[in-house]
């Protein structure tokens, strides 16, 4: 860990961030991730700048998730504990598979020159390197997972760091901390005692601009940059694989990045003219960019409890290409009153989620309900009642489910399965599932431009972001005509309860565009058993407008029932 001093650089962003880092921050009392024995120091102007300008030796127990990856008892890289059996490190640390059998992982490490009280050392059972990592381009996807042959026992000096929540990011200017036993000066010796240094996160534009000045410009998708243009504070050789950690809104330490690479140690890049003296920002693998991959491979303690009956306020990650979610997990279990349970479903990137209920027994939505949110927390609806909903296809790879119980109903339960499907698995029809989409696009009746089938019932729900309206524009419309459009027809609603009908269409004339007054649009197509036509084709677009807050719609089943 480089700790050489440099001239004082006054950054307003540092002052702004550190004001929030006060003694009033408190961590949960119950054992959980991101907790440290060392209390956060009260904020004051001089304390902050004394820490930013140089690195410093940490107090024992400051970062209980920090591990030392050792080859034949010699420190080579760092890592971060995220569960009793799993450690995250840099892929380049273990890219040579031949050395894995010679590696140990030591938790509770503080002073490399001695055996510290509370140290625990385990061997490695499994190594998982990100499939997109390449030694030819080692700065991209530089991350690996290590499964221990055994489990760390959590205590004062050993514990996990938090993984970020979905879509949780630490913005440019945020001051984070990296720690390790790396070299104290470029080309110098390793530090025997754990060191730390605080570094600001740079904007992507600053990062790219700095890297473009190098002799061999670096590109990638999964890294973030930290540091100061004039240098002086940085990670260094031996710190690789360690953590870039930031405090989240609740004050818990969260793994924002994995130490990856840098040109030199603490070199500035403001004047990268002479090739021999060029420097770069500190490069870290951005955890938010690879979070779905991490959850896909790691079974954390919480994940194994994904169906527990008492789960108030926890957010459980349930991931994989397919799986089941039963709540409660047994017919003999009941949840306590006034509970809130949260699950985040993750399927592989660039896939969509298909949900199918096999059991639903939840009383009126006024008391207990299961609500559903999309990517970016856009509300989809509430599920209640006893009639099974139709299968639901969600146009994203993530989904958040929230179950809320009242003070009396502790017998409600639901069972569902989830499965990853490729986009357009059932292209454009809306007839096999209730299809929920969050992007603009083209929809059309089943079999278009051929005739649609008899007895079709098809539904699409489009959900725009806040402050947007939805516009439906028809390219063609050929639907059996009736006086009041009750035989074959397209209906458009601005709610999912079908209470606010804004259009009912049939016949052979292309109608004018239909505009929903809200950020929700339900489009339905129905045909009877008496003859068919070509159907319709239309595009859906989102129009920016200062809008009202989106109220969470309620899906009162069996209202939205699809019948093939």
Swiss-Prot record:
Keywords noted in UniProt: Calcium, Disulfide bond, Glycoprotein, Hydrolase, Metal-binding, Protease, Repeat, Secreted, Serine protease, Signal, Zymogen
Biological process, per Gene Ontology: fertilization; proteolysis
PROSITE patterns (UniProt xref): CUB, TRYPSIN_DOM, TRYPSIN_HIS, TRYPSIN_SER
Disulphide linkage map: 77-93, 176-246, 207-225, 236-265, 311-341, 365-384, 431-458, 485-506
Signal peptide: 1-22
Pfam family, one: Trypsin
Domain Peptidase S1, chain residue ranges per copy: 52-299
Family statement drawn from the similarity comment of this UniProt entry: Belongs to the peptidase S1 family.
Name recorded for this polypeptide: Ovochymase-2
């Amino acid at each position: 860990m480089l700790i050489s001093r440099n001239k004082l650089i006054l950054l307003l962003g540092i002052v702004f961030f550190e004001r929030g880092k006060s003694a009033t921050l408190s961590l949960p009392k119950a054992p959980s991730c991101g907790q440290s024995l060392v209390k956060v120091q009260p904020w004051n102007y001089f304390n902050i700048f004394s820490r930013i300008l140089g690195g410093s030796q940490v107090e024992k127990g400051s970062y209980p998730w920090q591990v030392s990856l050792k080859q034949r008892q010699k420190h080579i890289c760092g890592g971060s504990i995220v569960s009793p059996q799993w450690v995250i490190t840099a892929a380049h640390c273990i890219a040579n598979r031949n050395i894995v059998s010679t590696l140990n992982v030591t938790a509770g490490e503080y002073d490399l020159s001695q055996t510290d009280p509370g140290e625990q050392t385990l061997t490695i059972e499994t190594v998982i390197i990100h499939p997109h990592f390449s030694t030819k381009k080692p700065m991209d996807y530089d991350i690996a997972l290590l499964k221990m042959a055994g489990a760390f026992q959590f205590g004062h000096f050993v514990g996990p760091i938090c993984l970020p929540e979905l879509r949780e990011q630490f913005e440019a200017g945020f001051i984070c901390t990296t720690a390790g036993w790396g070299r104290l000066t470029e080309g110098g010796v390793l530090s025997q005692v754990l060191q730390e240094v605080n570094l600001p996160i740079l904007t992507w534009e600053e990062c790219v601009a700095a890297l473009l000045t190098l002799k061999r410009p670096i590109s990638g998708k999964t890294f973030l940059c930290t540091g100061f243009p004039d240098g002086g504070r940085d990670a260094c050789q031996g710190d690789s694989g360690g953590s870039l950690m930031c405090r989240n809104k609740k004050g818990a330490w969260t793994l924002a990045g994995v130490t990856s690479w840098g040109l030199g140690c603490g070199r500035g890049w403001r004047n990268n003219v002479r090739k021999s003296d060029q420097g770069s920002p500190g490069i870290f693998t951005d955890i938010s960019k690879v979070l779905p991959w991490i959850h896909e491979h790691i079974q954390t303690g919480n994940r194994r409890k994904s169906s527990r009956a008492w789960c108030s306020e926890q957010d459980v990650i349930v991931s994989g290409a397919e799986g089941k979610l039963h709540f409660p997990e047994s017919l003999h279990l009941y949840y306590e009153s006034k509970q809130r349970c949260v699950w985040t479903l993750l399927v592989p990137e660039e896939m969509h989620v298909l949900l199918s209920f096999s059991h639903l027994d939840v009383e009126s939505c006024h008391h207990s309900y299961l609500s559903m949110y999309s990517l970016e927390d856009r509300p989809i609806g509430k599920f209640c009642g006893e009639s099974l909903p139709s299968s639901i296809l969600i146009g994203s790879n993530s989904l958040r489910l929230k179950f809320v119980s009242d003070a009396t109903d502790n017998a409600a339960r639901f069972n569902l399965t989830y499965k990853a499907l490729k986009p357009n698995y059932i292209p454009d029809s809306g007839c096999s599932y209730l299809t929920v989409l969050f992007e603009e696009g083209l929809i059309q009746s089943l079999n278009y431009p051929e005739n649609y089938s008899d007895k079709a019932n098809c539904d699409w729900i489009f959900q725009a972001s806040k402050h947007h309206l939805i516009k439906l524009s028809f390219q063609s419309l050929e639907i059996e005509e009736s006086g009041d459009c009750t035989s074959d027809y397209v209906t458009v609603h601005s709610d999912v309860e079908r209470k606010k009908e804004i259009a009912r269409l049939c016949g052979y004339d292309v109608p004018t565009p239909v505009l929903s007054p809200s950020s929700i649009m339900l489009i339905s197509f129905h045909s009877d058993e008496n003859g068919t036509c070509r159907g319709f084709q239309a595009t859906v677009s989102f129009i920016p407008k200062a809008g009202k807050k989106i109220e969470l719609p309620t899906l009162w089943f069996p209202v939205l029932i699809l019948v093939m």
